[in-house]
Amino acid sequence: ERLAQTKVKIDRVIHDLTNMEQGNFKVRFAPNPNASLTVGHMRGVLINKYYADKYNGEFVLRFDDTSTDVKPPIIKAYIQILKDIKWLTGKAPDDVLIASDRMDIYYDYADQLLALNGAYMCNCKNFKELKDASIPCPHRDLSVEENLELFNKMKQGDFEAGEWVLRARTDLDAPNPAHRDFVLFRVQRNAHPRTGDSYK
């Protein structure tokens, strides 16, 4: 009874961002187009749009649609999500990017990272145990040339799903194990609804 009579005041103020310059600001909303937006997504849309408007910035919709195995994209979801955002905010996003349309860009950056020895190919089955113990995987010692050759084979579809991945070379002593040599690219065999079998 007493609990029912208690009124709780909730702070619903959206706080200012510090050191933010007007007009030099972008926010990104990156849903996976495998369903309609949820209430949680809608909250993200509205907060991002609020900040974009407040600081005269851009609101960018980026469809994160490269996973055909875990969250297969649905063509209708691209359209529905865009409609939902227009309905929620009163206008279309300032820019719309589709990750699957940018695979060649991502491949180019991966090649550059490999050339700088900032990434490596790995097929360790026990990688999680190594990562959690901050132990380097044996593939970290592959040469730049070996890594580039393996990555080219990956792009050509020479490997099966789960056989090889491209990992970022990071700090193995990072406090959060998720930040240690995380996966940048992996092989997928399911066709993409927009790009088909163009990328593996």
Regions found by a protein language model. Name each.
Residues E1-L142:
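N-terminal Rossmann-like or analogous alpha/beta NTP/dinucleotide-binding catalytic cores
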Residues I98-A99, Q112-K200:
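Active-site cores that bind ATP or allylic diphosphates and position pyrophosphate for catalysis
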